[in-house]
């Protein structure tokens, strides 16, 4: 559906995109994540040639946008919609007129415009706001208007540039649920860029990680846990892993005692079996659960435990082997000293 081949883009001699190669499948929700300045927004704007790459090809639905005339590029963009962090609504226009704007620019008949808006308003849950002005709407409602406007010309691709970063957590959840519903309802390919892993894990099937203008990793969300060196996996782990309390970290040593502190990451079926109790019985060892969390990523259940073991080095090795056999990732965080030392 979307294929980027050898993209490069510079600003004032500084390379913003460096040899980007990426394929996004039709109908998927694809996330691009990275820190500020990684090149995410530039990449997104190159997909619809709002920023023209210095080198490379942008192929959408079999058509190379880089080779099109200005007129044909404008026509191709009709099928590529975009929403932003800021809603960019016309304050002097009603919700109806804001949604109608792209269709009126294309010269679509007013009766067809009315039909399309009447179709879209229930989808974005704004049926009762048709005649309201932006000043009368909440931030989430404004973004829903922007989404309806983006859908008005029946695009095949929806580009989302930090579309939830200006919203509170509850509204963010609602907008992400709406994007997922739109994907399922219309089969639109959604490309979403963000610096928040929580956004990616909520709705994306696959993701790319960007660092300094390069894509350093592309993976299915459900495969992250099978890649020990995955940067995306480390980002997910950091998000779901509970933070160790100060009262515990100040008692940690890097030399071996018989109280190793271990973090365990579970995935899929391993997250639902009574592994701790079984292992405690099999190895005849005490396992004290200190912290725990469980979450879901693209339908896959994942969990993290921080446990304190009562184990000498040989027993710790047996515990680690038992975890690895069960497909559980193990990280020894340190060794707990007696309180007061």
Swiss-Prot record:
A GO CC annotation given for this chain: plasma membrane
GO terms of molecular function: ABC-type D-methionine transporter activity; ATP binding; ATP hydrolysis activity
Enzyme Commission number: 7.4.2.11
Subcellular location: Cell inner membrane
Residue ranges of the TM segments: none
Gene: metN
Similarity comment: family membership: Belongs to the ABC transporter superfamily. Methionine importer (TC 3.A.1.24) family.
Binding site for ATP: 34-41
Gene3D superfamilies: 3.30.70.260, P-loop containing nucleotide triphosphate hydrolases
Described function: Part of the ABC transporter complex MetNIQ involved in methionine import. Responsible for energy coupling to the transport system.
Span of domain ABC transporter: 2-237
Reaction(s) this enzyme catalyzes, per UniProt: L-methionine(out) + ATP + H2O = L-methionine(in) + ADP + phosphate + H(+); D-methionine(out) + ATP + H2O = D-methionine(in) + ADP + phosphate + H(+)
Record keywords: Amino-acid transport, ATP-binding, Cell inner membrane, Cell membrane, Membrane, Nucleotide-binding, Translocase, Transport
Main localization (coarse): membrane
Membrane topology per record: Peripheral membrane protein
Family annotation (InterPro entries): AAA+_ATPase (IPR003593), ABC_transporter-like_ATP-bd (IPR003439), ABC_transporter-like_CS (IPR017871), ACT-like_dom_sf (IPR045865), MetN_ABC (IPR041701), MetN_ABC_transporter-like (IPR050086), NIL_domain (IPR018449), P-loop_NTPase (IPR027417)
SUPFAM superfamilies: ACT-like, P-loop containing nucleoside triphosphate hydrolases
Subunit structure: The complex is composed of two ATP-binding proteins (MetN), two transmembrane proteins (MetI) and a solute-binding protein (MetQ).
Protein name: Methionine import ATP-binding protein MetN
């Amino acid at each position: 559906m979307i294929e980027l081949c050898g993209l490069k883009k510079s600003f004032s001699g500084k390379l913003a995109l460096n040899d980007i190669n990426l394929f996004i499948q039709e109908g998927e929700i694809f996330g691009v994540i990275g820190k500020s300045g990684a090149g995410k927004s530039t990449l997104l704007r190159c997909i619809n040639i709002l920023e023209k790459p210095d080198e490379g090809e942008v192929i959408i639905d079999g058509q190379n946008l880089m080779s099109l005339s200005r007129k044909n590029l404008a026509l191709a963009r009709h099928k590529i919609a975009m929403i932003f962090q800021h809603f960019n609504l016309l304050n002097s226009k009603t919700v109806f007129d804001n949604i109608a704007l792209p269709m009126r620019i294309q010269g679509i008949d007013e009766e067809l415009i009315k039909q399309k808006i009447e179709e879209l308003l229930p989808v974005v849950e704004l049926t009762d706001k048709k005649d309201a002005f932006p000043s009368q709407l909440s931030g989430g409602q404004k973004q829903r208007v922007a989404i309806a406007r983006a859908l008005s010309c029946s695009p095949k691709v929806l580009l989302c540039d930090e579309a939830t970063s200006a919203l509170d957590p509850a509204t963010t959840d609602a907008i992400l649920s709406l994007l997922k519903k739109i994907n399922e309802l219309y089969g639109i390919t959604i490309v979403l860029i963000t610096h928040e892993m929580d956004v990616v894990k909520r709705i994306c099937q696959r993701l790319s990680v960007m660092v300094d203008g390069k894509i350093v990793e592309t993976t299915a969300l459900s495969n992250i846990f099978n890649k020990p060196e995955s940067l995306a996996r480390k980002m997910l782990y950091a998000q779901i892993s509970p933070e160790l309390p100060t009262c515990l970290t100040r008692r940690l040593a890097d030399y071996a005692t018989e109280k190793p502190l271990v973090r365990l990451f579970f995935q899929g079926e391993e997250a639902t079996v009574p592994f701790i109790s079984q292992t405690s019985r099999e190895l005849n060892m005490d396992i004290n659960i200190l912290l725990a969390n469980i979450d879901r990523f693209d339908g896959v259940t994942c969990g993290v435990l921080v446990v304190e073991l009562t184990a000498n080095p040989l027993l710790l090795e047996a515990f680690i082997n038992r975890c690895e056999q069960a497909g559980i990732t193990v990280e020894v965080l340190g060794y707990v000293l007696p309180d007061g030392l």
